Amino acid sequence: MILVLLMVILMMIFIVQSIAFITLYERHLLGSSQNRLGPTKVTFMGLAQALLDGVKLLKKEQMTPLNSSEVSFLLVPGISFVVMYLEWFTLPYFFDFISFEYSVLFFLCLIGFSVYTTLISGIVSKSKYGMIGAIRASSQSISYEIAFSLYVLCIIIHNNVFNFVSKFNLSLLIIYIPFLIMVIAELNRAPFDFSEGERELVRGFNVEFARVAFVLLFLSEYGSLIFFSVLSSAMFFKFSIFMAFSIFSLLIFIRSSYPRYRYDLMMSLFWFKLLPISLIMLCFYAVIFYY
C-alpha cells in the first residue's frame, strides 16, 4: 500500500515536471516557426522560465466575480486536474501497479466527464465570455465524441481486449489521421480551439481564473496533451520516447501553421465526414477480425 502511494506521488511529480519543460519546448518551437528565438534569457537557454512563470502566476491576485463562490473557483480546476491525472493510469505497461482490465472504458468515461469541468468553469465564472466558451466546448465535444468512441472501438476489435495494447499496429495506421484530428479536438488545440478564441472571447472559459485555479487548468490542459502523445505512440507505433516526442511536436507545428477553423465547418467535418468514416471502419474491422 505504501509503495503504491509512493508511486502515485512520484507519477504526479513526474507529470508536473514534464509539463514545465514541455511548455518551454513549445515556446521554442513556436518561436522557430515565426523566425524568432523564444525564451532564452532566464538562466541557461531559458530553462528556468517555466518555473518562474509558475511563481509569478501564484503571486497574482484572485478576483472572484460577484454572485460566484471562491470554493467553486478552486473545486472545478481541481476536478479537471484529477481527471487528467487519472487518464495516465490507462496507459499500457507503464503503471501496472494499479492496472485494471477495462481501462479503455474507464478512459472513455474520463474524456466524457472532462467536458463537464469546462462547462462548469464557464458557468461559475459568471462571465458572458466564459459562458460562451463553455457552450462552444460542450457542443464541440458532442460533435466529435461519438466518432472518437467508434475509432477507439476499432482499436478494441483489432486487439480483442478492453485494454490499450502497446504494439506496432500496421493495420491501424489507416485510422491514425482521423484519430489524430479527434485528439486535437479533444485537447481544444488549434485549429479547433473555439473555447479559447482570444479575438472574440478574450480568453474563453477560463478568463476569470487566476493563481492556483489557473495553474490547475493549465496543468490539466498540458498534462492531457502529453498523455495523448504518449497514448498515440503506444497504440500505433509500439511506445517509444522518440515517437511520443514527434507526435507532440506535430501537434505544436499544427498550432503554429493552421488558423482557427470555422465553427460551422468544424461541425460539418465531424458529423458528415469523420462520423461516417468511423462507422465504415468499424464495420470493416468487425468483418475482418470476426468473420
Swiss-Prot record:
Record key words, sorted: Electron transport, Membrane, Mitochondrion, Mitochondrion inner membrane, NAD, Respiratory chain, Translocase, Transmembrane, Transmembrane helix, Transport, Ubiquinone
EC number: 7.1.1.2
One of the record's GO cellular component terms: respiratory chain complex I
Topology with respect to the bilayer: Multi-pass membrane protein
Compartment(s) where it occurs, according to its Swiss-Prot or TrEMBL record: Mitochondrion inner membrane
Catalytic reaction list: a ubiquinone + NADH + 5 H(+)(in) = a ubiquinol + NAD(+) + 4 H(+)(out)
Chain segments annotated as transmembrane: 2-22, 71-91, 104-124, 142-162, 164-184, 212-232, 234-254, 269-289
Impact when changing I181M: In strain: CB4853 and CB4858
GO BP annotations, alphabetical order: aerobic respiration; mitochondrial electron transport, NADH to ubiquinone
Entry keyword Electron transport: yes
Domain of life: Eukaryota
The UniProt record lists the keyword Methyltransferase: no
GO molecular function: NADH dehydrogenase (ubiquinone) activity
Cited function: Core subunit of the mitochondrial membrane respiratory chain NADH dehydrogenase (Complex I) that is believed to belong to the minimal assembly required for catalysis. Complex I functions in the transfer of electrons from NADH to the respiratory chain. The immediate electron acceptor for the enzyme is believed to be ubiquinone.
Similarity remark: Belongs to the complex I subunit 1 family.
Protein name: NADH-ubiquinone oxidoreductase chain 1
Higher taxonomy: Eukaryota, Metazoa, Ecdysozoa, Nematoda, Chromadorea
Gene for this chain: nduo-1
